């Protein structure tokens, strides 16, 4: 009975997602500037427009991360660091000292122009592009992939660029 209550209380609402990463990734090609096209809402980027993420590869496969955006015309930025894991396409990212979060590149086009990123949680999803606007066919393909993976794409916030 206790087990059943635990499942009802904690397990039934868990969204099943496929957050598997790309099979290979060249971090030198992934590095650089990315526009955040869409994202799930989360506290640390709430109401931000013109969002970008810049990744700079350092020694020992460490990556410096700079996230920028604007809120009510005011420039906001957050610097962090990332480190690679044994799983291709998966990073550990920190913006707050020793506390790391999961970051997964789940879809990446062959030319490293567009990406679908997430984490181990169904609460994080983002669409990145090297350009501020996605081609409609590319957008629909990424949305279809996210939906196939179990994400509710109706929750995406489309970022003003």
Stretches with model-predicted labels:
Residues 12-161:
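A beta-rich soluble binding module of mature secreted/lumenal proteins
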Residues 1-9:
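Bacterial N-terminal signal peptides
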């Amino acid at each position: 009975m206790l087990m059943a209550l635990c499942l009802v209380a904690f397990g039934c609402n868990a969204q099943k997602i496929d957050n598997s990463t790309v099979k290979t990734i060249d971090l030198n090609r992934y590095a650089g500037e990315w526009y955040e096209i869409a994202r799930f809402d989360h506290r640390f980027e709430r109401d931000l427009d013109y969002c970008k993420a810049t990744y700079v590869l350092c020694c020992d496969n460490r990556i410096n991360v700079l996230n920028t955006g604007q809120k009510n015309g005011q420039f906001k930025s957050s610097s962090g660091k990332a480190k690679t894991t044994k799983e291709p396409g998966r990073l550990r990212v920190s913006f707050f000292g020793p506390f790391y979060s999961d970051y997964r590149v789940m879809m990446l086009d062959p030319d490293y122009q567009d990406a679908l990123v997430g984490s181990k949680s169904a609460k994080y999803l983002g669409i990145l592009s090297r350009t501020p606007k996605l081609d409609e066919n590319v957008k629909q393909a990424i949305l279809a992939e996210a939906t196939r993976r179990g994400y509710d794409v109706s929750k995406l916030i489309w970022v003003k660029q």
